[in-house]
C-alpha cells in the first residue's frame, strides 16, 4: 500500500471529452501557476485532439500552448497522449517523422508520453518508445482496454509484458469507453502487478457511471496513479472528480497528500468556465449524465452518438438497434479491433452501411478496406482469409509493420511550406494536418504583419494591408 498519484486531465482529456477540445489557452492560463503548486503526479495537458483543435478551430499554435504551460508549471511533470505511429494525426507516418515529433515534444516541455495503438500492436509503438527513451522522456505505454471473446486477463497480461519488454517505464490501462467494472478491474490489476515490474496507472471514463468505483478497486489491487479531472469538468464522458477521489483516500494508506483547500481554489477558477460552456451550448448537459447503454452495447458513448448522427443523416434513426447489433459482428469479421480512434469510426461507419444498404459489405469504406488489408497493423485476432479476399480483392495483404512501407521525409514537408516557415515545429504541424495547418500559418502571418488575408492575391504574392 502506498500513496496514490493523481494525473490531472482538466487541460486535455476532460474538455476533449465534454466540449470537443474547445478550451482556449487564454481561458486556463490564469490558473496554471496555482495548479503547479498542487503536487500532482502529472498534468495531462497536450496531445490527443488538442493539437488538431488548436490549429483547426482555435487559431492557436499548439506548440505555443505547450511552451506556455511549461513556463507556468516548472515544478509539475507535463504529460501528453500520443498515438504511436499515428502521432496526433489520422494515418501512419514514417519513423523519421515520429522520432522528430517525440524530440520536439520533449524539447518544448513534455516529460511523460502516454503512447498507445488502437489495435494494441506493439510494432506501432516501438519507434515512439525508442525515441522517448533516446530524448530522456518517460515512456508510459497504454493498453487500449476493450471487451470481447479474446480480451481476457491473459491477453492483457501478455500485452503488458510485451510493452515492458519494448521499453515502457510504466503502463496505463486506458479504458476510453468506460467499460471496466470494479471487480473486473481488481482482478486485472492484480494479474498485471504479478506480470510486470513497472508502475501501473488507471484511466477510466465516467460514461457508464462506474469510474470512481473502478478507481477504488484498482487502488486496492495496487494501482499507483489514477487519472481524474477537476469537478467542474468531471463526470459524464469525462473522469472521476479530482477532489472527490482525494477526499475518498484521505486518512487511508492510499492518501494522495493533496490539499483539498488548494484544490478548491482551482475548482473555483473552472466553475465560471463550465457555466460559460453551458450557456454557449458548447457543453451539452447530456454529456454530464450516465449512459448505462455503454455497458449494454459495449461501445463507447461517443461512438453511440456518432452512429445516431449518421443514421439521422440517412433518415434511418429507427435502425439504431440493428446497427448496434451489427457492430459486434463487424468487429468479429475484422479481427476484434478495440473501439478507439480511429477503429471505432471505421467499424461504426461500416456497420451503418451494412444495415442501411440491406446487404452486408455491399458498400465498403476505404478505411475499413485498409484495416482489413493490414494497413493499420495487426488485429488482435486473425482475419479469415476468405473475408479478406471479399473485402480487399486482389490487393496485397500487409503483414509487415505498416510504417515500413512509409518513407515521408522532413525536408520534403519543409519545402512545401517554405513560404510560411517560422519554426522547426511547423514541419510537424503541416505533416499531420496539411491544409488545416497552412490556413493557420496564413492567419499567423497576416496577424504578424498586419495583413488582410481576405484580399490576398496569392498568384502575384500581393497582400492587402
Where are these regions (language model features)?
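N-terminal amphipathic alpha-helix/helix-capping segment at the start of soluble metabolic enzymes
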Residues: 1-19, 66, 71
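Glycine-rich phosphate-binding active-site loops on the catalytic face of alpha/beta enzymes
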Residues: 115, 175, 221-238
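Terminal or standalone catalytic/regulatory effector modules within metabolic enzymes
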Residues: 36-54, 284-294, 298-465
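Non-catalytic positions within long, well-ordered alpha-helices that form the structural scaffold/packing
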Residues: 36, 106, 164-167, 219
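Catalytic cores of alpha/beta
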Residues: 151-163, 208-224
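C-terminal helical cap(s) of enzyme catalytic domains, especially alpha/beta-barrels
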Residues: 234-256
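Hydrophobic faces of well-ordered beta-strands that scaffold small-molecule active sites
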Residues: 6-13, 41-45, 76-84, 113-114, ...
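Active-site beta->alpha loop and helix N-cap motifs at the rims of alpha/beta catalytic domains
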Residues: 47-164, 171, 177, 181-182
Amino acid at each position: 500500500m502506498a500513496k496514490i498519484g493523481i494525473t490531472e486531465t482538466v487541460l486535455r482529456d476532460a474538455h476533449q471529452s465534454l466540449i470537443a477540445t474547445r478550451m482556449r489557452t487564454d481561458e486556463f492560463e490564469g490558473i496554471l501557476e496555482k495548479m503547479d503548486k498542487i503536487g500532482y503526479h502529472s498534468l495531462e495537458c497536450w496531445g490527443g485532439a488538442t493539437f488538431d483543435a488548436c490549429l483547426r478551430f482555435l487559431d492557436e499554435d499548439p506548440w505555443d500552448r505547450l511552451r506556455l504551460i511549461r513556463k507556468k508549471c516548472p515544478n509539475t511533470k507535463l504529460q501528453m497522449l500520443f498515438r504511436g505511429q499515428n502521432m496526433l494525426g489520422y494515418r501512419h507516418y514514417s519513423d523519421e517523422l515520429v522520432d522528430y515529433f517525440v524530440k520536439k515534444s520533449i524539447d518544448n516541455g513534455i516529460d511523460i508520453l502516454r503512447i498507445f495503438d488502437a489495435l494494441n500492436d506493439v510494432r506501432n509503438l516501438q519507434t515512439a518508445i525508442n525515441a522517448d527513451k533516446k530524448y530522456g522522456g518517460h515512456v508510459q505505454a497504454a493498453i487500449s482496454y476493450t471487451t470481447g471473446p479474446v480480451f481476457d486477463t491473459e491477453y492483457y497480461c501478455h500485452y503488458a509484458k510485451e510493452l515492458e519488454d519494448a521499453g515502457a517505464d510504466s503502463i496505463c490501462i486506458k479504458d476510453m469507453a468506460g467499460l471496466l467494472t470494479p471487480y473486473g478491474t481488481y482482478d486485472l490489476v492484480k494479474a498485471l502487478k504479478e506480470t510486470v515490474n513497472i508502475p501501473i496507472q488507471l484511466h477510466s471514463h465516467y460514461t457508464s457511471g462506474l469510474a470512481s468505483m473502478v478507481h477504488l478497486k484498482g487502488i486496492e489491487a495496487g494501482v499507483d496513479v489514477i487519472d481524474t479531472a477537476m469537478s467542474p469538468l468531471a463526470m459524464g464522458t469525462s473522469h472521476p472528480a479530482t477532489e472527490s477521489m482525494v477526499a475518498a483516500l484521505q486518512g487511508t494508506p492510499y492518501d494522495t497528500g493533496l490539499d483539498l483547500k488548494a484544490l478548491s481554489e482551482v475548482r473555483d477558477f473552472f466553475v465560471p468556465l463550465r457555466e460559460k460552456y453551458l450557456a454557449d451550448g458548447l457543453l451539452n448537459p447530456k454529456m454530464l449524465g450516465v449512459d448505462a447503454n455503454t455497458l449494454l452495447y459495449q461501445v463507447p458513448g461517443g461512438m453511440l452518438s456518432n452512429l445516431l448522427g449518421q443514421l439521422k443523416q440517412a433518415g434511418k434513426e429507427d435502425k439504431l438497434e440493428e446497427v448496434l447489433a451489427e457492430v459486434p459482428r463487424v468487429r468479429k469479421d475484422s479481427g476484434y479491433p478495440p473501439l478507439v480512434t480511429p477503429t471505432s469510426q471505421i467499424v461504426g461507419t461500416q456497420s451503418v452501411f451494412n444495415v442501411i444498404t440491406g446487404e452486408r459489405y455491399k458498400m465498403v469504406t476505404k478505411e475499413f478496406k485498409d484495416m482489413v488489408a493490414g494497413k493499420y497493423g495487426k488485429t488482435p485476432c486473425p482475419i479469415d482469409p476468405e473475408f479478406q479476399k471479399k473485402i480487399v480483392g486482389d490487393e496485397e495483404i500487409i503483414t509487415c509493420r505498416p510504417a515500413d512501407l512509409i518513407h515521408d521525409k522532413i525536408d520534403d514537408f519543409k519545402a512545401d511550406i517554405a513560404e510560411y516557415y517560422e519554426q522547426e515545429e511547423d514541419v510537424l504541424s503541416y505533416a499531420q494536418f496539411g491544409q488545416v495547418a497552412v490556413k493557420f500559418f496564413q492567419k499567423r502571418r497576416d496577424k504578424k504583419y498586419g495583413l488582410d488575408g481576405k484580399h490576398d492575391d496569392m498568384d502575384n504574392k500581393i497582400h492587402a494591408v
